[in-house]
Amino acid sequence: MPDYGLIEMFRPRPEWYALSREERRTFLAGCRREIERLLGGGVRFLGVYASRWSGEWHGYSACECPGADSAQEWIDAAEKAGWFRYFEQANLVGRKMSLEEYFHTLVEL
């Protein structure tokens, strides 16, 4: 069972809009190859969600990771691929716990 979750919220930067459609396709093909490599390491990609209509972020993705290190590896791979040159992003990494465990942490605040 995965122990950590990763949420990535992102929106395009002006540099993305400056690329041609062909340049965008080429860039995203490279990102896809890197994602497929990471999935072989136990990361489970839950999906990408379009959210521009409901908030300030264009979209977000969610993954389950076997550990905090694999979540960080996912973020590092995005940086290496040049993702942050074209997209502003905020990440959340958290440890998975039961509802009861989480409620206990709230009581203990």
Where do the model's predicted regions map?
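Conserved short beta-strand edge segments in small beta-sheet-based binding/regulatory domains
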Residues: 83-95
